[in-house]
Every structure is written in C-alpha cells, then in structure tokens.
C-alpha cells in the first residue's frame, strides 16, 4: 500500500454532512419538511415540540427521533394512536432512507444525512 501524506481530516475538509429531513407527504401540512439538526427531535400536537403536527389524531408528545451518527431511530412516547414505520406499529425502530412514518393522519418520509462536497474554487 503506497503511503500518502493525505489524512482523513484532509479528505473531509471539503465535505459537509447535511442533516436528515422528515417530509410530510400526506396530511394537513403536506409539503412541509423538517431538518433534524438536533440530537433529539420531539414530534407532537404541542407547539413546544420540534415538529408540531396540529391535528387531534396526534398526541401532545407523540414520538421522538434520536440521531445516531448518520442514521436515526424513532421512539413512540406512549401515544394514543401509535407510531407506524413502513406499515408496522412500533415502540422504537431504526429509520432508513425512504422510511415511511405514520403519526395520526400524517404520513412522513425520512431522508438520511448525506455527505455533500463543498466547492473550494481551487
């Protein structure tokens, strides 16, 4: 293996990791998208949540998404109507790119973090 003076930090200097995104594809707020920039994002009918879903089918504190490296998982917080991932009711589940999340009347799609090359002009 040839040696090189280029290190991993050097290679990553021109790369930005975008935050994962949760997009509403069905429900009262269709078209809205939320960047999951925090380590933990709460979802619910209470406006204090990171993702506020204003509908009576959503519990005040319904679920939370926990970022883990480049991925994430969702946990139900004891909601009345449950949290569904890819058609199955879950207490907790990993999220993958394209995962469908149903919370009340809302259907949301999870989009993973992605590395993005930053143009340096060199």
What are these regions (language model features)?
Residues 1-54, 66, 116-122:
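Intrinsically disordered, low-complexity acidic Ser/Thr-rich regulatory segments
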Residues 30-107:
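Forkhead-associated
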